[in-house]
Amino acid sequence: MTMMTMMMVSWSAFLQICWILMVRANQFNPGEPSGCRTNTPQSDLNSFLWTIKRDPPSYLYGTIHVPYTRVWDFIPQNSKQAFQESSVVYFELELTDPSTISALSRCQLLPAGQNLQDVLPPELYLRLKTHLEYVRLMLPSWMTPDQRGKGLYAEYLFNAIAGNWERKRPVWVMLMVNSLTEADIKTRGVPVLDLYLAQEAERMKKQTGAVEKVEEQCSPLNTLDFSQVIFALNQTLLQQESVRAGSLQVPYTTEHLITHYNCGDLHSIISHDTAQVPNFNNVTLRPSDQVTAQQIDSYFRRELIYKRNERMGRRVTALLQEQPHKTFFFAFGAGHFLGNNSVIDVLRREGYEVEHTPAGQPLHRRSGWRSADPADTDAALQPFLHHSRHHELQLLEGLELLEKVEHKLKKKHRRNKLKKQRQFNDLWVRMEDSVTAEAPPPLIHIINGYITVQTHPQEHERANHDRTFSGSSSRTGPALSALAVCVQMLRLLL
């Protein structure tokens, strides 16, 4: 399936981006994202690491839900070192547990006996079906030569992402549609940063865990008012229809967000105060749509920002208290640590001293530890900084489709727990089950729509294998597309 992003920031960050986009939609100048606006090397800019000052120290790290290969070279060495030196690694969810995958899939489905056609307005359903047919036709041209070279084929890829879409709840269909874009399709095949960290933690025999349950992440979306879900799905379709017609460029893309992450400047697009209510005077939404958007905002703030960050912060505190002699590494979407009402605020209220750790700053050590020599640090990081084409292509296992995954993996778990390799990816978008897909060709691994390819051994030698760590669309103006853009931010940053 598919942190700083998908991102993979808090719900508060998501909402702030939404409102900024809606208020300033007409001010954006679409185009290619530029590099960091500074002469400082990019590798020295990106620090989403915070240190919990105690003995021994623990760490908070902000992830982004994009392929790890897009951001890993820009992550500072001290962030990687913090991961290496931590004995316990916690994520939002159990990222490699097959039961997590199954639960995430089940939570997307409509009640037994219901199909999407039964619950959507007829006109909206037909528009959705038309758009998915368009995506199916376009997929072959969207795929990269590298993907085709690995053996992926378009029909299988479509079924892996959108299979069984008529059984999904509308809110999950909205997220699915938002991920069925050319830019997103081109990223399929490489684990997102969160999953890669989880797999590395398992490989390094670290203790792992989660601070949230699947139900806690699913329930707020599934209980969103139905009329508001229809509003959001309609806006998402309007945006995609406008892009198809050539009348709209998405003003803020995944590429822009990756640039902000790699430059370490997410604060440039995220307000510091989650309590601020933007001025809507410049918004071109109709008054009724503004009311709906504000209702969604109020719901998200209550259920998905404050409650979630408070709950996560309390559980981090409990873990620190229960195991005071262990070094923790908490890897959550970066926005959980940004702005007010964050996880960091909860920890500080509980009496913990939490400080941002810039790139290049030495890590705090246990009492009595000597300062690290650079040569010693490099040697200590070698097990963590490995990276080969062979390892990259073997990160995900399992050819079974979603309905087979749970049964087979659990059966294997009972037979031999040590032989099990479990999968996970993007928490919100790339969790689609694909029960309509036929058996894939050998060495192509799919779990809930997130695809990783394992090539044959003779294909492992490549020149770049040595990377480190080793409606009508005419109704859609810039402001009308803002909600759909916000969904993009949601899946990448939360």
From Swiss-Prot:
Q: Its topology with respect to the membrane?
A: Single-pass type I membrane protein
> Which of the residues are on side Cytoplasmic?
489-494
According to the record, the signal peptide region is: 1-25
Q: What are the UniProt keywords, alphabetically?
A: Cell membrane, Glycoprotein, Hydrolase, Membrane, Metal-binding, Metalloprotease, Protease, Signal, Transmembrane, Transmembrane helix, Wnt signaling pathway
Against Pfam families, the record matches this protein to: TraB_PrgY_gumN
Subcellular localization(s) per the UniProt record: Cell membrane
Q: Which GO terms describe its biological process?
A: head development; negative regulation of Wnt signaling pathway; proteolysis; Wnt signaling pathway
Could you give the cofactor binding note from the entry? Divalent metal cations. Mn(2+) or Co(2+).
Q: Which residues are tagged as glycosylated in the record?
A: 234, 282
Which loops or segments lie on the Extracellular side of the membrane, by the record? 26-467
The superkingdom listed in its UniProt entry is Eukaryota
InterPro entries in the cross-refs: TIKI1/2-like, TraB/PrgY/GumN_fam
Q: What parts of the sequence cross the membrane?
A: 468-488
**What are the protein's GO molecular function terms?**
metal ion binding; metalloendopeptidase activity; Wnt-protein binding
* GO CC aspect terms: membrane; organelle membrane; plasma membrane
Cofactor(s) annotated in UniProt: Mn(2+); Co(2+)
Does Ribosomal protein show up as a keyword for this record?
no
This enzyme's EC code(s):
3.4.-.-
Protein family per UniProt = Belongs to the TIKI family.
PANTHER family in the cross-refs:
METALLOPROTEASE TIKI, METALLOPROTEASE TIKI1
Cited function: Metalloprotease that acts as a negative regulator of the Wnt signaling pathway by mediating the cleavage of the N-terminal residues of a subset of Wnt proteins. Following cleavage, Wnt proteins become oxidized and form large disulfide-bond oligomers, leading to their inactivation.
- The identity of this protein, by name, is Metalloprotease TIKI1
Query: Which gene codes for it?
Result: trabd2a
